Design a protein with these regions (language model features):
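C-terminal helical/tail subdomains of lipid-metabolizing enzymes
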Residues: 3, 24, 28, 38, ...
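Short coil/turn segments at secondary-structure boundaries
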Residues: 6-9, 45-49, 129-130
Length: 171
């Protein structure tokens, strides 16, 4: 795991920058970058829970906060640069960046074609995808990266997401 979390932007840099040996030409017609995520959790803390947290609770959550922030930052940059049919809403201010494409191209094709497939690991999304209810504990267990016991359920979720286009929550 790196701070990139979603390594797509790093891969684009390796493929195109002069310091690396590949020197691919930029352009939506030249580069198709497909990124497949592993699922992600939502940070939804209600005020009562937050006010009851101690420093140790907060410290244990910092790695996930940093990884999610890095992933969303990379996602925003790639959507900003690209022709992207799988745009995700980044936040309430910038949305999905569909109207903010960086290019001088009058056709607005972008500097690459980028696709991001991922899904929220939350009870409503999982119910829709798997046609069964998940408790808060079950969802928490799925999200916990070090919980090897979840690997079989995560595999089933991944298969179902692939069959459904992995666009359960993309906008």
């Amino acid at each position: 795991v790196s701070m990139a979390n979603n390594p797509s932007l790093q891969l684009l840099m390796v493929a195109t920058l002069k310091g690396f040996p590949f020197h691919w030409r930029m352009g939506a017609e030249n580069i198709l970058l497909v990124s497949v995520g592993t699922g992600m959790s939502k940070w939804e803390k209600i005020p009562q829970k937050v006010s009851k947290q101690n420093l140790l609770n907060w410290a244990s959550q910092i790695p996930d906060m940093l990884m999610q922030d890095a992933s969303w930052h990379n996602q925003a940059i790639l959507q900003w640069l690209s022709n992207c049919d799988t745009r995700w809403s980044i936040d309430g201010e910038i949305g999905d960046l569909a109207d903010d494409l960086i290019t001088n191209d009058p056709d607005k094709k972008g500097l690459l074609t980028y696709l991001r497939y991922n899904l929220w690991l939350d009870a409503p999304t999982l119910k829709q995808l798997m046609n069964k209810d998940y408790t808060t504990k079950q969802v928490d267990d799925l999200v916990e990266m070090s919980n090897a016991d979840s690997r079989f359920e995560l595999y089933k979720i991944g298969e179902a997401a692939a069959k459904n286009g992995a666009q359960v929550n993309a906008t």
